[in-house]
A protein has these predicted regions:
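Conserved catalytic-core segment of nucleotide-activated headgroup transferases in glycan assembly
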Residues: 3-85, 91-92
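Glycine-rich phosphate-binding loop at the start of an alpha helix
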Residues: 34, 87, 107, 161
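Conserved acidic donor-binding segment of nucleotide-sugar-dependent glycosyltransferases
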Residues: 136-144, 152-157
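Short acidic/histidine- and often glycine-rich active-site loop of Leloir-type glycosyltransferases
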Residues: 124-139
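Glycosyltransferase donor-binding loop in the core domain
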Residues: 29-32, 105, 138, 172
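A charged, aromatic-enriched C-terminal amphipathic alpha-helix characteristic of glycosyltransferases
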Residues: 158-188
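Short hydrophobic beta-strand element within catalytic cores of glycosyltransferases
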Residues: 109-113, 119-122
Length: 189
């Protein structure tokens, strides 16, 4: 049974022309998140920024100095934010990246992004435990493929809209109270 259950849904009308930037969400008290951001900043973001000039918003509590003191052009470190500010970021950024290289289990940050209808680009580690995610998100592990995928989808309004619609439909089908009760019923039959 999933730990992520929603009673109400966002019904986001994704409007790419009103959105900008790439968002990462994850607490830095968890080592895989720090590794993910450092790897993204070192190996992926420079080429992404060179190609599409997209800002990179970093959200997460307990950000260490090496994150909070970043001066890289285009990088905006938000640190810890309120639920309201996080919701605003989900509703104003074009896509979420989850560049995890290690860690286990279903990633709440991926499910939450899908819930908000924001397109997701992740690694296979970020996709772990979310059946069928490759049909609604972009899953890549190789650095250059991640760069290419982010740049291509970021500039493709139709693809962004399609991914947003698919992610919201997926959350309704897999993470609604009804879906979870159906799983419980199946387990007891």
């Amino acid at each position: 049974i999933t730990a992520y259950v929603y009673e109400k849904f966002m019904n986001v009308t994704y409007e790419p022309e009103k959105r900008e930037g790439i968002l990462f969400v994850g607490g830095f008290g968890h080592a895989p998140n720090l590794d993910a951001v450092q790897w993204f900043l070192d190996k992926i973001y420079p080429d992404v920024y060179k190609n599409i000039k997209a800002n990179f918003y970093i959200v997460g509590s307990k950000a260490p100095d090496e994150i909070t003191h970043i001066t890289t052009e285009g990088v905006i470190v938000k640190g810890f934010v309120s639920e309201e500010e996080l919701k605003q970021l989900y509703n104003s950024c074009r896509l979420v990246v989850v560049p995890l290289r290690y860690g286990a289990g279903v990633k709440g940050k991926v499910v939450e992004a899908l819930y908000y209808g924001i397109p997701v680009v992740t690694t296979s580690v970020g996709a772990e435990g979310i059946g069928g995610i490759e049909n609604i998100a972009i899953v890549e592990d190789q650095e250059q493929k991640l760069v290419n995928a982010i740049c291509e989808v970021y500039q493709n309004d139709d693809k962004l809209i399609e991914m947003s619609e698919k992610s919201q439909r997926y959350v309704r089908e897999k993470f609604s109270t009804e879906a979870v009760w159906d799983i419980v019923k199946e387990d007891f039959e």
